[in-house]
A protein has these predicted regions:
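Intrinsically disordered, low-complexity acidic/polar segments
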Residues: 15, 52, 61-63
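Generic structural motif
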Residues: 11-13, 57-59, 103
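Charged phosphate-binding loop/patch that engages nucleotide di/tri-phosphates or the phosphate backbone
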Residues: 93-107
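An amphipathic, aromatic/His-enriched active-site/gating alpha helix that lines ligand/cofactor pockets
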Residues: 36, 57-95
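Short, glycine- and small/hydrophobic-rich beta-strand elements in well-ordered beta-sheets
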Residues: 30-51, 55-59
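Short amphipathic alpha-helical segments
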Residues: 14-39
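Active-site-flanking beta-strand signature of metal-NTP-handling nucleotidyl enzymes
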Residues: 4-9
Length: 107
């Protein structure tokens, strides 16, 4: 199992809309998340920053992320969410959400 933490900015004028959208995530998007081996997925907000955490339980992370990106309903969802977000300037090339390094964990 792989734990993933990510961060991204949120446009200040989109906070309420982003929270409304995520209060009713489309069932097809939730099904794709599950089909791509993502579990225990949460997004937290602090001011204009979003922190996402999930656990990946599959065997091929890159293939599952490509599968998610190829899903038509997920891509449609992203047309709503991406304009609300503000990627960090420090993100790696090709990243939208900036991956974070895990520095501590305990069960």
């Amino acid at each position: 199992m792989r734990r993933v933490g990510q961060i991204i900015g949120l446009q200040p004028d989109q906070i309420e809309a982003y929270e409304r959208l995520h209060a009713a995530v489309w069932p097809e998007v939730l099904a794709t998340i599950h089909a791509c081996n993502i579990r225990n997925y949460s997004i937290f907000r602090h001011g204009e920053q979003l922190f996402a955490y999930f656990e990946y339980v599959g065997d091929d992370y890159e293939a599952d992320m490509a599968k998610m990106a190829a899903d038509a309903k997920t891509r449609e969802w992203w047309t709503w969410t991406e304009p609300m977000q503000a990627p960090l300037e420090t993100r790696a090339p090709g990243e939208w959400w900036t991956k974070m390094k895990e520095v501590f964990h305990t069960d």
